[in-house]
């Protein structure tokens, strides 16, 4: 399944928001591949791989939260209206967008998980696939949020 995920997501070359911003980049996949390859010995317990993926997810989730906070503060400090007050409409849209993205991310990773033999996060292999999806989705959203500041 991991090969399916990497090949599927690795083949996506869509660009969004900016000419040089790729939806899924090599870093997204390389961090996941590193977790699998560093721990791919036959003797390695899948829980070691899962732990590596969990650490990577925690890292990218922290980066996402930082990017969201920076985008929020940017909108507060540089309102699109030119008026020297926070743009509450745009701040509310950012909040709604983030909530909608969280729902999308969860559904997207459920879809990936549906390809597994055991579609339950209590299964370590399924959880590893789910974490891989979460890492890719989170990195993608982080780049999107960073673009809001740079546009």
PLM regions and their residue ranges:
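N-terminal signal peptide c-region/cleavage motif recognized by signal peptidases
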Residues: 11-15
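Positively charged n-region of N-terminal signal peptides that target proteins for export
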Residues: 1-4
């Amino acid at each position: 399944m991991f090969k399916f995920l990497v090949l599927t997501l690795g083949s996506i070359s869509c660009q969004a928001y900016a000419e040089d911003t790729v939806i899924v980049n090599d870093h997204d996949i390389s961090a996941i591949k590193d977790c699998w390859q560093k721990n791919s010995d036959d003797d390695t317990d899948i829980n070691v791989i899962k732990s590596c993926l969990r650490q990577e997810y925690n890292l990218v989730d922290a980066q996402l939260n930082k990017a969201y906070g920076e985008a929020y503060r940017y909108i507060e400090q540089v309102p699109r209206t030119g008026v020297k007050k926070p743009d509450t409409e745009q701040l509310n849209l950012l909040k709604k967008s983030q909530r909608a993205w969280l729902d999308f991310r969860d559904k997207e990773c459920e879809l990936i998980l549906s390809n597994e033999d055991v579609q339950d996060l209590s299964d370590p292999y399924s959880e590893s696939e789910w974490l891989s999806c979460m890492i890719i989705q989170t990195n993608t959203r982080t780049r999107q949020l960073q673009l809001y500041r740079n546009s």
